[in-house]
Amino acid sequence: MGEINRRNFLKVSILGAAAAAVASASAVKGMVSPLVADAADIVAPITETSEFPYKVDAKYQRYNSLKNFFEKTFDPEANKTPIKFHYDDVSKITGKKDTGKDLPTLNAERLGIKGRPATHTETSILFHTQHLGAMLTQRHNETGWTGLDEALNAGAWAVEFDYSGFNATGGGPGSVIPLYPINPMTNEIANEPVMVPGLYNWDNIDVESVRQQGQQWKFESKEEASKIVKKATRLLGADLVGIAPYDERWTYSTWGRKIYKPCKMPNGRTKYLPWDLPKMLSGGGVEVFGHAKFEPDWEKYAGFKPKSVIVFVLEEDYEAIRTSPSVISSATVGKSYSNMAEVAYKIAVFLRKLGYYAAPCGNDTGISVPMAVQAGLGEAGRNGLLITQKFGPRHRIAKVYTDLELAPDKPRKFGVREFCRLCKKCADACPAQAISHEKDPKVLQPEDCEVAENPYTEKWHLDSNRCGSFWAYNGSPCSNCVAVCSWNKVETWNHDVARVATQIPLLQDAARKFDEWFGYNGPVNPDERLESGYVQNMVKDFWNNPESIKQ
């Protein structure tokens, strides 16, 4: 069959399948599966580009990491005025009820504050205090927020909180953690901790020793080096890996580290924290301690100038994400954050033993999504997350900077942006209405941005103050925008359907409907997800199914 005829045949096949879907979703699934992979490759082929695929205006300036929602929390100035949303009432834009506009007042009431909304700092610290288990959530003991669920969440986040340096919030350089020394002669643990490097450790002292001994490993080519490094990265725990060239545009303009001070805990121990937890729990209000700020000087803090960035992705559990916004969905996010640090540390040690400098990073040091796009791992979606072909947005990103020159991968396009233009499901599912409903992304201007956004790049607007306000109200991270995403599937044929639908005019309006016809995602409306019992049923399924659903 000629290529044109084959293309037409497949288009007709998909159109017929779509029409039949209304009558019989299960039958269509059987019809479509054998066809969609070929159809997607012909109608919507995956392409590579040598240039960064999104517009970056000449006015673009590097992002200050201390402006992001969670790092801004620890700026005392953010505790002086009420938290501000970019749009006070998004119902004027969406035509739907604004389910997020009252969150600042509700969060203030949760803190015992009357007569005003919560500040930015109060909002975020309310979230952190509940998330760390120091304060019960308002849903405590409901299905998905029980002591069992919360214990799983604590275990999942433990490495990130205790050994990574709490770098999930951003910052840099590297990480520091408080540890309690032990007397090896008496086995007594000290009451006072000391600050030491965490897993995101930039100590490259071993590299010079390897080089001085003439033991630096020499690769035959950049291509061979990339192949070996990718293989090692997968073995050490990554699910996906790509190589990006070092691009200074994505390095934060300011690095920062939260200032920790000693806080006396009820058990008599001193705990170092970036906010005064005992004062808050006793009703004395919220107090934070600010930042230590650093110029982004690679040679000073890491001993080298990066040439390449190893960017890797860790999958989050499909069944756990389906329970969003429950604590179970937070647990798989926490597991990935904990694993990010472990895997990044192991990659860094591997490189150092070969005689190359390395700086392992999580959300700190630089913006992960554009680096992952450059590394060919996916596209940037409406929800601001990286959409991969295999996991959709259901993953976390980490990276390791190195002076080893590697052959970079190329950005790939497989239909995500075209699909996001049509779908808007994540925007509809957001309890805070933080995600733009505009059809097309655009190069954002300063007036389009809330304080945590960086203007002059092409994307959809996101309001992190709205998002963070719901996290505080919920007492746990929310992953609704991930859970309902049509790319969040363990069967990749659905992704092929999405790619095809964006390219055929008659199917475009139905693009987001395919997975709904096939029974995926549950309710999109955030209130209905809870009120219908869907989230509660997904939590029960999670605990009752001993084997995880894997890709």
UniProtKB/Swiss-Prot annotation:
GO terms for cellular component: cytoplasm; extracellular region; plasma membrane. Keywords: 4Fe-4S, Cell membrane, Cytoplasm, Iron, Iron-sulfur, Membrane, Metal-binding, Oxidoreductase, Repeat, Secreted, Signal. Its cofactor is [4Fe-4S] cluster; corrinoid. PceT is required as a chaperone for prePceA maturation. In the absence or presence of exogenous vitamin B12, the intracellular corrinoid level decreases in fumarate-grown cells and the PceA precursor forms catalytically inactive, corrinoid-free multiprotein aggregates. Exogenous vitamin B12 is not incorporated into the PceA precursor, even though it affects the transposition of the pce gene cluster. Predicted to be exported by the Tat system. The position of the signal peptide cleavage has been experimentally proven. Its EC number is 1.21.99.5. One of its GO terms (molecular function) is metal ion binding. Disruption phenotype: Chloroform inhibits the growth of the wild-type strain, but not the growth of the PCE-nondechlorinating small deletion (SD) and large deletion (LD) variants, where the former fails to transcribe the pceABC genes caused by a deletion of the promoter and the latter lost the entire pceABCT gene cluster. [4Fe-4S] cluster 1 binds at C420, C423, C426, C485. Gene3D superfamilies: 3.30.70.20. Residues 411-440, 478-496 form the 4Fe-4S ferredoxin-type domain. Disulfide bonds: none annotated. Binds 2 [4Fe-4S] clusters. Optimum pH is 7.0-7.5. Optimum temperature is 37 degrees Celsius. PROSITE patterns: 4FE4S_FER_1, 4FE4S_FER_2, TAT. [4Fe-4S] cluster 2 binds at C430, C467, C478, C481. It catalyses: trichloroethene + chloride + A + H(+) = tetrachloroethene + AH2; trichloroethene + AH2 = (Z)-1,2-dichloroethene + chloride + A + H(+). It comes from the Bacteria. Induction: Expression is highly induced in the presence of PCE and TCE. Located in the pceABCT gene cluster that is flanked by insertion sequences including transposase genes. PceA, pceB and pceC are cotranscribed. PCE-depleted cells grown for several subcultivation steps on fumarate as an alternative electron acceptor lost the tetrachloroethene-reductive dehalogenase (PceA) activity by the transposition of the pce gene cluster. Exogenous vitamin B12 hampers the transposition of the pce gene cluster. It is found in: Cytoplasm; Cell membrane; Secreted. Belongs to the PceA family. PANTHER family: IRON-SULFUR CLUSTER-BINDING PROTEIN, IRON-SULFUR CLUSTER-BINDING PROTEIN-RELATED. Catalyzes the reductive dechlorination of tetrachloroethene (PCE) to trichloroethene (TCE) and of trichloroethene to cis-1,2-dichloroethene (DCE). Can also use various chlorinated ethanes such as tetrachloroethane, pentachloroethane and hexachloroethane. Reduced methyl viologen can act as the artificial electron donor. This is Tetrachloroethene reductive dehalogenase. The lineage of its organism: Bacteria, Bacillati, Bacillota, Clostridia, Eubacteriales. The gene is pceA.
